[in-house]
């Protein structure tokens, strides 16, 4: 029996549920040298901000048990360069690859400006509103830790966006549920879960943090149980679709997160361990489903029917 | 599509100086065109280490289908690697680094100065080999902590004269490479048609300063990396002329011209 | 040169800074069969509650990459049995081993009653106020996530306790600093950091959580970078001593956490991987210090002078 | 102080049925007094797996200084274990379990019924061996999924008659062990002086029910464990007579009398 890996989310008719996570795959040009990105279900590009950003000083990454810390600091060429170069490059080579644009900013006005502009790109099918970056002084967590601030920002972004807006929530909160509810009420099309936890490594020799930014975002296998918990928790209070992520490295991990309530899966850190992680997972999904006598995702994520 | 990932087999591994290992890996990566200065990114066989480890390519032997890495055990990853036995298969990405050491501009009998320190020296071996194969005359200037930690002395001396500096003076010149350059290679900027360097930051800064105007002088940088292919922006460095422009060491380097980037 | 591993904290003059973490070493009777507990710097016993508790249904543990989840649910024989049997058993065999009593409860009255009673045991040198257990319906996180509630509880417990009170904070909060500050102002002698993160694993076959309690506390190596960050963050706003914990398995891990600001180190999950983890770490500390030309902890943790 | 941790060496490892491995470990643990039903807790050689894996002791061979484990590959840990080659050293805790199968009460020529299912069967081998060594007459009744998954048939038949039930009827009785007991061992409660069981929950419940009044009937339980020594309270089970009293399977078990605990 052949498998049907398709999943359908607002704005996103995907041939399979697997997509590179924002910030772990640039704008596709690098990994695009090594395999055909058309294999992917979708692709979440690196955060776009209004102005070009240089990000933080180096070192920007450090290793942790079954995980890593990053403090890239949203380096990106800015919305204009992304509109002029990055998105057209993708559109030309991969006209059928749905792009999800990760959007960040310092102020509401920044977010709104970028959402309005980037959602007009013909290959951008959805926005992932990044209100959860732990590595920048402004924006990021400020909007992501208060239900009111998150709702106000979401509403403003939804109003100007031509495509559905998924809000990427932070795991670094006491209770994610009021934030998720507020964001849903403000018009979000779905959630993206989870961004990185905040962590630190110290060099015992210098007794200083390894990262120039001191703290960084913890990602990779180590955070998978936290991602499962938060996806499960948000699923328990909302029927909106969830793009799940956090420590997915195998088809088994992907199914576990989908069993928790995710409708599609983003893969971040695993790309670094294994550059072919995404195509490998996509290839392994039919056999993984077959282990449980399944051939599609229909019975996953309670809300799948609704879509 | 470019090739990227290889399953290489440990042919043999030897501790050639205290804590310095020579690792010979066999597999078809050895058939790829490798520019010296390019590197590989090795998956350490440990479930808990997600990040690969970058190492310069010290030797390519297409005839025997092997490449050689030389590395120092500094932390958990290199420790585990050093305990891997013959026959172990390793997933290796490479050759990585969009820019290795340029050598096409040199002609037979021209002269190259190769400056290195510690574990920056490995890629300079492949460089020197390629230069000598072209008929270029090479001079090596290497810095080490002490006599004990010197490795590949015979290999380099086979390729060309080699001057040593050690911190403690236990072998060669006493002091760091910068001082050795000042004292014994004061005319290097005009004597040599090309300058190549790899090593610790201090050494690179010394070379970058001394040969900032040399039209053919190159340094190779290191930085903590995640993807190794240019996708994650972990390993950036700023352009000297315009620090708002950032280059990725893994992809736009690891070799840069002197005076090109902020050290 | 010989090393001096002593550290000195309120109530705790320790011959070395290593102690088993609460809940990972019972009341000492089990590991006491296999090695001399006098080797330990101190020992934090399993949570004590007013009434005997049965804890949660099984399965109570699940594995995660470089970590584990537990949902024991504070099973313990209750304060009376602990006073009558567990503490005397320890006092008789290990008269010089400083015991830290982990105290939990449903209500402020529960906490106060247990603190008052247990702090009178002659071998209890300090209390670790557990306001951060994620695995119980009441108490635990309720007190641990609000600065006001944490302060009120701390004040009440400090008032009745005969020994210094260290407050064990939760990592599952948006910002730990106001909670730490409130607890300090309320009279805490120090902090204990960190309790477990909240996580979940799902059995892909049944699509149900593996743990009967659904969620569990994530501990082990995986959370080390989060522990380092929180210890560092609390150290940056307080000079109170910190008992640091979270993923310590080696002497190197212990030094890293001490470099972040911890004055002593508790070892939890590592006991399960390696039952001799604590004595092994203690034995390895002198060489680990010597790597950095150190022979004691004097230059660690900025507040060491103050004590 | 009691001994606890051993470094055992893999002597050999064989797949004796699909996905079922026989692992022989050599080292001085084999010199300890082991009660059948006791278990070991094995550190899987993977940096990312913190919890040890418990396995019943299937055989102790003091003369050759080895113990044998029999296990099924069900997840990551057993998969990695099955790929370990001869000579690999494993950290093993044991013998664990304060209560194995009591056999001292039995006299030569008395009769014991040993009931097992799937991977519950391994510790029953050591039990049967010890009983036979005492002169006790043993009867085995084992359940398997199908003929293919049966293991240690010759080993058990050497010790005593062995009846099989398979779910699909491909070997022996068709159906589960409970039905086989009803049909062919209806008088077991009076015929046998002792009853011992290990296997899946359903089997244990069947045995617990049928032999609840038998003065000498024992079942061995499994539960997810962390410490394996009684310190963490992960593996508790409740007493039938008073469910407010909880016992630890790792320490107060893993063997309990029938009718003793809530299943
Ligand atoms: C392009 C390049 C080429 C290199 N070539 C060589 C070589 O030929 N021989 C050699 O001995 N070393 C070389 N290095 C350094 C080598 O990568 C590190 O020594 C190694 O990664 C340390 O790993 P570890 O697990 O032992 O150390 P740990 O400190 O435990 O590593 C922790 C993390 O930090 C990273 N890291 C630590 N030190 C360095 C470093 N100096 N540079 C980059 N990342 C680091 C590791 O990759 C890992 O992600 C090179 C580095 C780069 C960037
Ligand atoms: C006292 C005792 C004796 C046992 N004896 C045997 C034996 O002789 N032969 C045999 O094949 N199996 C035996 N088991 C079961 C065996 O421990 C598990 O099959 C094994 O731990 C699975 O590990 P894994 O990594 O392959 O599976 P995973 O599912 O990946 O393991 C994840 C976690 O769950 C735990 N776990 C999973 N299944 C079980 C289980 N059934 N019981 C306890 N913990 C589990 C693992 O130990 C690990 O902590 C015994 C279990 C216990 C408690
Ligand atoms: C190097 C790196 C860069 C990242 N950059 C971004 C980013 O720009 N925007 C964003 O929303 N998330 C960013 N993330 C977070 C990931 O998209 C993802 O949410 C997180 O890493 C968890 O998934 P993983 O465990 O699969 O990596 C980044 C993560 C890493 C490791
Ligand atoms: C099985 C288990 C039981 C625990 N029980 C308690 C407890 O009773 N009280 C408490 O404050 N913390 C408890 N903890 C948390 C630990 O004390 C410790 O804070 C945490 O596990 C982090 O340290 P580690 O990574 O070294 O395990 C428990 C942890 C585990 C794994
Ligand atoms: S390591 Fe990812 S961009 Fe260089
Ligand atoms: S596994 Fe820890 S008490 Fe049984």
UniProtKB/Swiss-Prot annotation, chains A, C:
- Note the subunit structure: Heterotetramer of 2 PyrK and 2 PyrD type B subunits.
Q: List the disulfide bonds.
A: none
The cofactors it requires, by name, are:
FMN
Pathway given for this chain reads:
Pyrimidine metabolism; UMP biosynthesis via de novo pathway; orotate from (S)-dihydroorotate (NAD(+) route): step 1/1
Per UniProt, substrate binds at 46, 70-74, 130, 195-196
Q: What is its main location?
A: cytoplasm
Protein purpose: Catalyzes the conversion of dihydroorotate to orotate with NAD(+) as electron acceptor.
Task: List the catalytic activities from the record.
Answer: (S)-dihydroorotate + NAD(+) = orotate + NADH + H(+)
Record flagged with keyword Nucleotidyltransferase: no
Q: What class of enzyme is it?
A: oxidoreductase
SUPFAM superfamilies for the chain: FMN-linked oxidoreductases
Give the protein family: Belongs to the dihydroorotate dehydrogenase family. Type 1 subfamily.
Q: How is the cofactor bound?
A: Binds 1 FMN per subunit.
Tell me which PROSITE patterns the record gives.
DHODEHASE_1, DHODEHASE_2
The alphabetized UniProt keywords are: Cytoplasm, Flavoprotein, FMN, NAD, Oxidoreductase, Pyrimidine biosynthesis
Q: Name one GO cellular component term.
A: cytoplasm
Q: What is this protein called?
A: Dihydroorotate dehydrogenase B (NAD(+)), catalytic subunit
Q: Which gene encodes it?
A: pyrD
